[in-house]
Amino acid sequence: MATLQLLRAPLLCVLLWVFCAPGARAHDHGADVHHGSVGLDKSTVHDQEHIMEHLEGVIDQPEAEMSPQELQLHYFKMHDYDGNSLLDGLELSIAITHVHKEEGSEQAPVMSEDELVSIIDGVLRDDDKNNDGYIDYAEFAKSLQ
């Protein structure tokens, strides 16, 4: 259970990081979860270098000219694969597993399906304030505060 909470924080962080760094392009980068026991990890979302990697070729604005809020928005959009301005369980799953792979070493244990489901359920429970089964941008931004 503690492992799930630790992975949840990195998922949310990755999401925040993508939104906060210019030059990040839509890519399969995950989000960190960290919000109390479950949620977005602010440090990952604010990792400008990683976000810029993903926005390269997508955003022409220099990273120095982007506000943290602009970076957060780009990070969010980067993980919104279907373009509906909402993050669903599958999009959260992709973000989480991407972060798990990047942060772990080659010997990092594979996350089980049950662990992944538990993390996603925790993110939705803690951050989906209107209980619609999705994380919208307002909920995403609020979870990073």
UniProtKB/Swiss-Prot annotation:
One of its GO terms (molecular function) is calcium ion binding. Ca(2+) 2 binds at residues 128, 130, 132, 134, 139. GO terms for biological process: carboxylic acid metabolic process; gene expression; protein transport; vesicle-mediated transport. It is found in: Endoplasmic reticulum-Golgi intermediate compartment; Endoplasmic reticulum; Golgi apparatus. Keywords: Calcium, Endoplasmic reticulum, ER-Golgi transport, Golgi apparatus, Metal-binding, Phosphoprotein, Protein transport, Repeat, Signal, Transport. Residues 1-26 form the signal peptide. It comes from the Eukaryota. GO terms for cellular component: endoplasmic reticulum; endoplasmic reticulum-Golgi intermediate compartment; extracellular region; Golgi apparatus. The MCFD2-LMAN1 complex forms a specific cargo receptor for the ER-to-Golgi transport of selected proteins. Interacts in a calcium-dependent manner with LMAN1. This is Multiple coagulation factor deficiency protein 2 homolog. The gene is Mcfd2.
